[in-house]
Design a protein with these regions (language model features):
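Short, well-ordered coil/turn residues at beta-beta hairpins
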Residues: 13, 178-180, 184-185
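Acidic, metal-coordinating catalytic segment for phosphate/diphosphate chemistry
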Residues: 218
Length: 237
């Protein structure tokens, strides 16, 4: 069985980035958005199991460039400073938005965020993905296809105009046409040997289901790739 779908914006990957992108588009336009997620957006991506801190928040007395300097030093200078700065400049705004959606951020008796060091906020973030999933469900003009795996782009005249995928449970083959495509499939943690043996082999920061498919699709389609010279490896779970 095949199914053809048309949308304004296709978001491939329904993790934190994909969900937040959909919310941002929904709040700022009337574009139709389709999220395709190979798992389920309620518990998918790097933050599927939650997180207990925000490690790049710009606390009082600090500025975005301070985070850039820290990350650059930590990576021996192998960074795109412009990308780091852009992310750092927006993180506090995103944090405020997530708190309004229901994320619990710990505060002291004066109502100020509880910080650890120069760039860390303590949060109760075990439900960060369900919170985002609920917001996406309520967002206007946003549709979600869970358990649909996108495996390649549709390219015409050197421009990506959609993608192809299949339903993991239904077996339906999808041809999706889109005016714009956002790839939010995460990294490639699943390509590498885990740092824990046996039954604990998936006890790691990043989900083993991040296979690098988004990278591969981009490379095959001729997309410009960047920052591949730097690979972060979590030395602990």
């Amino acid at each position: 069985k095949t199914e053809k779908i048309s949308t304004d914006v296709l978001i491939i990957g329904g993790g934190t980035a994909g969900c937040y992108a959909a919310l941002t588009i929904s709040e700022n336009s009337d574009k139709k958005v389709l999220i395709c997620e190979k798992a389920h957006i309620k518990r998918s991506g790097c933050l599927a199991a939650g997180v207990n801190a925000l490690n790049a928040y710009i606390v009082e007395g600090r500025k975005p460039q301070d985070y850039v300097d820290y990350a650059k030093k930590d990576a021996d200078g192998i960074v795109r400073e412009d990308l780091l700065l852009t992310m750092s400049e927006k993180l506090n705004e995103v944090t405020d938005r997530l708190e309004k959606l229901g994320l619990v951020i710990l505060k002291d008796e004066n109502g100020k965020y509880v910080t650890r060091g120069n760039r860390n906020l303590k949060i109760n973030g075990e439900n960060i993905k369900p919170i985002l999933a609920d917001a996406v469900e309520k967002a206007k003009n946003v549709t979600v296809l869970n358990r649909v795996n996108i495996f390649d782009y549709s390219v015409k005249d050197n421009k990506i105009n959609g993608a192809f995928g299949f339903g993991i449970e239904s077996g339906i083959f999808y041809t999706i046409e889109a005016k714009a495509v956002i790839i939010a499939t995460g990294g490639a943690a699943g390509l590498y040997k885990p740092n824990n043996p046996g039954f604990s082999r998936h006890k790691m920061w990043y989900p083993p289901f991040n296979t690098g498919a988004g990278y591969a699709m981009g490379i095959r389609a001729g997309a410009e790739m960047t920052t591949f010279e730097m690979r972060f490896i979590a030395l602990r779970c």
